[in-house]
A protein has these predicted regions:
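Ser/Thr-rich, low-complexity intrinsically disordered terminal regions
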Residues: 3-159
Length: 159
């Protein structure tokens, strides 16, 4: 299955409305998948400074920061995100990204939220308004493209 997460008024969701995607690797053991996924994560993150954490072969947590990933007006917004991977024999479950977006404009912090909310509340913006209507189409598309590509690249495992 390809990870095709979309941003909805409730955050990132898969095509069925869930918060995960499952990648099948028939015949591969958990230890093999853990090693391959760990290597893929570390290779793909060259040039950035991600935090990578796993205390066993069951789960990997990756946190990363991408500066100026998207723009709100003239302000480049930094994305801080978490990707989580549950590993089992023959499959890896990738959970929807958890993303915080922030930036600075005229010396003040700007926050952009994925979920529904007021469109303007001081310097806080939302991709969807409180009725669930899309307000930031370009930002939504850029974020979806970035994270779907990121996950697809991470799941290109070499054994």
């Amino acid at each position: 299955m390809n990870a095709q997460f979309s941003i909805t008024s409730q955050g990132f969701k898969n095509n069925n409305g869930g918060d995960y995607a499952v990648y099948e690797f028939p015949g591969k053991q958990k230890a093999e998948l853990f090693q391959a996924a760990s290597t893929s994560i570390l290779k793909s993150m060259t040039g950035t400074l991600p935090s990578y954490y796993s205390n066993n072969e069951d789960f990997i947590v990756l946190t990363n920061k991408v500066r100026k990933l998207v723009y709100k007006g003239i302000s480049g917004l930094t994305a801080e995100y978490i990707l989580r991977f549950a590993i089992d024999d023959g499959k890896i479950t990738v959970y929807a990204p958890k993303v915080d977006l922030s930036g600075i404009a005229n010396g003040a912090e700007i926050l952009l939220f994925l979920d529904a909310g007021k469109t303007w509340n001081g310097r806080h913006f939302h991709i969807f308004d409180k009725e669930g209507n899309l307000k930031e189409d370009e930002i939504k598309m850029k974020l979806e493209n970035y994270f779907n590509e990121e996950i697809e690249n991470l799941m290109q495992l070499n054994f």
